[in-house]
C-alpha cells in the first residue's frame, strides 16, 4: 500500500475509487495499491 498526495493509475487494471471519503487505487497487482492521505 503506497500512500501519496496524488494517486494515479499505473496499468490498465488499476481503478480509482472512493471509500468513506478516501481516494484509493485497487488493482490485480498488489504493488499498485495506493491510498491518498
From Swiss-Prot:
PANTHER family: 50S RIBOSOMAL PROTEIN L36, CHLOROPLASTIC, LARGE RIBOSOMAL SUBUNIT PROTEIN BL36C. Keywords: Ribonucleoprotein, Ribosomal protein. InterPro entries: Ribosomal_bL36 (IPR000473), Ribosomal_bL36_sp (IPR035977). GO terms for molecular function: structural constituent of ribosome. This is Large ribosomal subunit protein bL36. The keyword rRNA-binding does not apply. HAMAP family: Ribosomal_bL36. The lineage of its organism: Bacteria, Pseudomonadati, Pseudomonadota, Betaproteobacteria, Burkholderiales. GO terms for cellular component: cytoplasm; ribonucleoprotein complex; ribosome. NCBIfam families: rpmJ_bact. Belongs to the bacterial ribosomal protein bL36 family.
Amino acid at each position: 500500500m503506497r500512500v501519496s498526495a496524488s494517486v494515479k493509475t499505473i496499468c490498465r487494471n488499476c481503478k480509482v475509487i472512493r471509500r468513506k471519503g478516501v481516494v484509493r487505487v485497487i488493482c490485480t497487482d498488489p504493488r499498485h495499491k495506493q491510498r491518498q492521505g
